[in-house]
From Swiss-Prot:
Present with 2240 molecules/cell in log phase SD medium. This is Pore and endoplasmic reticulum protein of 33 kDa. GO terms for cellular component: endoplasmic reticulum; endoplasmic reticulum membrane; nuclear envelope; nuclear pore. It is found in: Endoplasmic reticulum membrane; Nucleus, Nuclear pore complex. The keyword Transmembrane applies. Pfam families: TMEM33_Pom33. Belongs to the PER33/POM33 family. It is a multi-pass membrane protein. Residues 1-24, 75-98, 148-176, 221-273 are cytoplasmic. Keywords: Endoplasmic reticulum, Membrane, mRNA transport, Nuclear pore complex, Nucleus, Protein transport, Translocation, Transmembrane, Transmembrane helix, Transport.
């Protein structure tokens, strides 16, 4: 919305004082800190410890944003924390699905466990939530910024959201599919193999990675069952993978791949949700 020219504006300090009384403001701050730490995560490629710290903080802040949304649902009686109904709620509430997955990964990250790619889709959502809140609730009241610049920023943000929201939502699903395939086809089976081989001397890193991987696969199944568009995109990626294997590898490799893929899918459908 364009910033009005003649309507008197409350001082920015007054606006902030009113905003900090609202849960949505902390939701906004959580999205900002998520984006900031996600950027720091990618800038810290030379330090594994710094990356781990940024990963933990990103998971924490984005979990807080989902917790705030769930709290709002709870206050308005849209969500009841009844353990007998939790399974049904988990199947239909995407906010609950994301919170559960992210919070479990946050807990496991305290033991140096990272699931690469798990942050991409939540961060995409954070970018759009951050921009929309900033445009509607803070930009009109910012001091020392000319009105024409505020209107320009408002217009640019509005156009970006309108033109790219659908595209980036689809990209978020693509990232979840890529992460789900990588974790389900390789990470979980590999760590399960290590678990069997090193039963007497298995490290917590293997167990933790296994738990984190299963958490993401469980989350992915919930998203897969709930979203028709994700099912369609998933089928396209599996078909591309099948075509690549049959086109570039010997026939026996294609048979092995199909057998392995069918085995993984059988296990996938047995995962309880």
């Amino acid at each position: 919305m364009t910033v009005p020219r003649n309507r008197p504006m409350a001082p920015f300090g007054t606006i902030i004082k009113s905003r900090i009384k609202q849960p949505q403001f902390y939701w906004f701050i959580g999205h900002f800190l998520t984006i900031f730490n996600f950027i720091q995560f990618h800038l810290s490629i030379t330090s594994k410890q710094n990356q781990l710290s940024c990963y933990r903080r990103s998971l924490f802040y984005i979990s807080v944003t989902y917790a705030i949304v769930l709290y709002q649902f709870f206050k308005s009686d849209q969500l009841k924390f009844n353990f007998t109904l939790l399974r049904q709620e988990m199947k239909k509430l995407d906010n609950l699905q994301y919170f559960a997955m992210l919070f479990i990964l946050f807990l496991l990250s305290q033991f140096n466990i990272i699931i690469s790619g798990s942050l991409y889709s939540p961060v995409i959502f954070s970018i759009f939530h951050f921009l929309n809140y900033f445009k509607e609730n803070l930009l009109p009241f910012l001091p020392l910024i000319p009105l024409n610049l505020k209107n320009l920023l408002n217009s640019k943000i509005t156009v970006f959201i309108q033109n790219y929201n659908g595209f980036f939502l689809q990209m978020a699903q693509v990232f979840e599919i890529i992460c789900g395939l990588r974790v389900g086809l390789f990470l979980v089976p590999f760590n399960f193999f290590l678990l069997l081989v090193r039963r007497a001397n298995v490290s917590f890193e293997v167990v933790g990675t296994m738990l984190a991987g299963l958490t993401y696969v469980w989350f992915f199944k919930l998203r897969y069952l709930q979203s028709e568009s994700m099912r369609q995109i998933f089928k396209q990626y599996v078909l591309r993978l099948d075509a690549y294997v049959s086109r570039t590898l010997p026939p026996y490799c294609s048979r092995l791949w199909n057998g392995y893929k069918n085995f993984v899918m059988t296990v996938f459908w047995k995962i309880p949700v």
